[in-house]
Amino acid sequence: MVQQSCGNDIPANIEKLKSNIRKCAEQGAQLVVLQELHNSVYFCQHEEAALCDLAEPIPGPSTETYGALAKELGIVLVLSLFERRTAGIYHNTAVVIEKDGSIAGKYRKMHIPDDPCYYEKFYFTPGDMGFQPIETSVGTLGVLVCWDQWYPEAARCMALNGAQMLIYPTAIGGVYTDPVEEQKVQSDAWQLVQRGH
């Protein structure tokens, strides 16, 4: 898994991601999962229409870039992209890239939060693809995205449909201005939800 800090320089973020993906492959990883919306900073902390310019089609520039890297390294990659489906319709989409660089499948985030610092409903339309696992050379992946983890039926549907492992690209964090005790309670609750899957 690659989880890294990102800045406003998207090309620099992508180069850093590619370097970290290479490190994972050098250590023997056959499957590498990137964090939610990994090409940029997590922009959903603000409602700003101009940020919709970050969206891209799938297939598109990111699937081409990461597809070439997956093929070069012989790994399966799970991406998390800001998808422009058509004018005015955007999704938070996980894309699975197979070892040959092709798109094995994608999943559009179904459960969209609208909480302080997570104003995703401003940007994303809920997914419309159901809970269909994606067949890959490393197994059948039940790919969901971040907030979906709080809805157990998503994991249940993926498992019932044949998923061998569940994957959640995630950008969720804590409120670091909260007291340390409260941060621990929140972290423990999140971990308990994950174990419940």
Model region roles, listed by residue range:
Residues I14-E15, H46-A49, N92-T93, M110, ...:
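Short, glycine/charged-enriched secondary-structure capping and boundary segments
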Residues A55-V78, T140, C146-H197:
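CN hydrolase (nitrilase-like) catalytic-core segments centered on the catalytic cysteine
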Residues D53-V143, R195-G196:
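Catalytic-core segment of enzymes that process non-peptidic bonds
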Residues N13, C24-A50, A70, L77-V78, ...:
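Active-site beta-strand/loop signature of hydrolases that rely on acidic residues for catalysis
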Residues H38-N39, E83, H111-P113, A171-G173:
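Active-site-proximal loop/turn and secondary-structure-junction residues that shape catalytic pockets
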Residues M1-G7:
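Short beta-strand segments enriched in small/hydrophobic residues
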Residues A12-K23, Y151-C157:
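Short, acidic/polar
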